[in-house]
A protein has these predicted regions:
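Phosphate-ester processing/binding pockets and catalytic centers
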Residues: 1-270
Length: 270
């Protein structure tokens, strides 16, 4: 790790990047309807302390790995409650595949299954860059660690670099804070701090998706527990467009009922 590094952003996702055949109201079979990213910014000086705390917590609840999909409801809620006392800052992003429109065909034409993932990751990193700009944190002070998967991370680095060099792209302003060469990947089994990003992505996904395991209803408790840890509007309490990005917004996502109400609450400075 570079000596100038003061923070590490750990990133994981929930859902998948397949945009060809995904579940909709009309199609009950297929890939996940959402791709959701979760990220946790950890100060370097507290990393070892947090690793020890997570290792102790893992033993306390009697699990081998802190993978949110493997935890029962009460253990997940307890995990979220534990995060409240940690020195971390959370970020998230939600994309609903139905809103992609013509972009779906564009990806298919490119035969690039990673393009959608990278574009969503760039939106997430824009949220980090916004925070860094507000806090006066320089590009070389933050390292970015994605949960390792079969993915060409050079394409992501190149995308960030290209966007930074495109003046008419509004996102370039905040992405200028991101150093592409500081992006890397690490296996979840080798870094327990990635479990915090995993929990964040899982919790955000649960708040928008109709879950078979929950009788067709989303689950909001996890996000309610985590909400205080998300970066928010410095002048209020709003986290949407600060710590969380809903691409296209809750209405164009066709969120309904309690899921829509909950997502809209993220836009409120209450």
């Amino acid at each position: 790790m570079n000596i100038s590094t003061k923070y590490v952003l750990y990133v994981d996702e929930s859902g998948d990047q397949d945009v060809k055949k995904f579940r909709t109201e009309e199609r009950v079979r297929g890939s996940d309807p959402f791709l959701v990213f979760g990220a946790c910014l950890v100060p370097v000086k507290f990393q070892d302390e947090m690793r020890q705390a997570l290792t102790t917590f893992k033993s306390e609840i009697g699990v081998k790995q802190l993978h949110s999909t493997d935890l029962v409801h009460l253990k997940t809620a307890y995990f979220c409650r534990k995060v409240q006392s940690m020195r971390v800052l959370l970020f998230g992003l939600v994309s609903k595949k139905e809103t992609l429109g013509g972009y779906t065909k564009q990806i298919a034409d490119l035969k690039d299954t990673e393009a959608y993932y990278n574009k969503c990751a760039a939106y997430l990193l824009e949220r980090l860059g916004h925070f860094m700009s507000h806090a006066g944190i320089g590009p070389d002070q933050v390292e970015i660690v994605f949960e390792e998967k079969k993915h060409d991370y050079n394409k992501l680095r190149n995308l960030i670099g290209t966007m930074q060099n495109t003046p008419h792209d509004d996102r370039a302003r905040y992405l200028s804070r991101i150093a592409p060469h500081r992006i890397r990947a690490q296996a979840k089994k080798d870094e327990i701090l990635l479990s915090l990003a995993d929990l964040t992505a899982f919790s955000l996904y649960q708040s928008v998706s109709k879950l078979h395991s929950n009788f067709g209803y989303p689950e909001f408790r996890y996000m309610r527990e985590l909400r205080p840890k998300f970066w928010k509007n410095p002048k209020g309490e709003k986290i949407a467009n600060f710590g969380v990005k809903y691409i296209q917004g809750p209405f164009k996502m066709n969120l309904e009922g309690d899921a829509l109400k909950f997502a809209l609450s993220m836009y409120q400075d209450k």
